[in-house]
């Protein structure tokens, strides 16, 4: 027992193991959450920082001391939960109690409008540089991570030559590599990997994001309005409404509603306007 205490208190491996156990217990639904027994209450502060087209907004969670600590920049992508979601707050507090300054970069276009805004990749590069420059951050121990499309953006941002050599680690949770595969899987309600294929019912947020990406390249405003009304707002369309769609509008509608096979989904995908593929 004494040896275990010494291992935890003195060695880097012991300290890491100890903090990891406390962190996991905090973020999972376990009856005992002991992080608060050993650390002060974290500070949560909204900050702003320059980005190419204006000002970025983020929430920073950190322990209330002046000790420079490791840090991570997180991007939740098209996050419908929002900044004050209990899960988001729990994650920020748990990471900061584990000794990691945690910065959540927020995108108004992606979070509020469920769009995929590639400008956020550049914004993440700027956000990383801002985080690295803070006095409460150890500049040689800064990483970047994300969830879903936010993870994809984080991976691209981390490879940017302006910050790549400074990125200590990357954590990507549920990123996707190929937008074509994502849309085809969502449209056919199946997911596949190599030779394995299984049914998949995509989350409404997934369909909402894809609907926004499809509708914004449709030339007909009535098509855009109908698809937005059905797949973003969750309303029903009448047979008359569907019959009034243009050919390209009907392509988008069928892709989002459901197709009979992946082959059909792929065929419809390649018939979408060129702007979508670009």
Regions found by a protein language model. Give the residues of each.
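N-terminal cap/lid segment of alpha/beta-hydrolase-fold proteins
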Residues: 19-70
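Structural cue for short, hydrophobic secondary-structure segments
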Residues: 74-77, 104-106
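Short amphipathic alpha-helix adjacent to the substrate-entry channel of hydrolases
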Residues: 86-103
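Alpha/beta-hydrolase-fold enzymes
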Residues: 156-258
């Amino acid at each position: 027992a004494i040896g275990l205490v010494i291992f935890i208190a003195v060695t880097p491996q012991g300290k890491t193991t100890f903090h990891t156990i406390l962190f996991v217990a905090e973020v999972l639904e376990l009856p005992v959450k002991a992080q608060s027994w050993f650390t002060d209450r974290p500070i949560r502060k909204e900050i702003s920082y320059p980005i190419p087209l204006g000002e970025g907004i983020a929430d920073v969670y950190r322990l209330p001391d002046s000790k420079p600590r490791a840090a991570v920049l997180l991007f939740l992508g098209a996050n419908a939960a929002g900044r004050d979601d209990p899960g988001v707050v729990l994650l920020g507090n748990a990471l900061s109690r584990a000794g990691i300054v945690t910065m959540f970069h927020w995108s108004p276009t992606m979070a509020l409008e469920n769009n995929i805004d590639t400008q956020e990749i550049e914004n993440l590069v700027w956000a990383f540089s801002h985080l690295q420059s803070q006095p409460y951050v150890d500049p040689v121990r800064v990483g970047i991570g994300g969830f879903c499309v936010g993870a994809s953006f984080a991976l691209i941002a981390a490879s940017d030559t302006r910050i790549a050599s400074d990125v200590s680690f990357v954590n990507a949770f549920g990123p996707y590599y190929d937008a074509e595969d994502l849309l085809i899987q969502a449209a056919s309600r199946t997911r596949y990997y190599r030779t394995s294929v299984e049914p998949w019912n995509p989350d409404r947020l997934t369909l909402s994001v894809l609907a926004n990406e499809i509708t914004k390249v449709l030339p007909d405003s009535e098509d855009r309005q109908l698809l937005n009304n059905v797949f973003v707002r969750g309303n029903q369309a009448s047979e008359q409404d569907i019959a009034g769609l243009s050919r390209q509008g009907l392509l988008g509608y069928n892709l989002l509603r459901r197709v009979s096979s992946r082959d059909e989904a792929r065929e419809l995908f390649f018939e979408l306007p060129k702007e979508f593929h670009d």
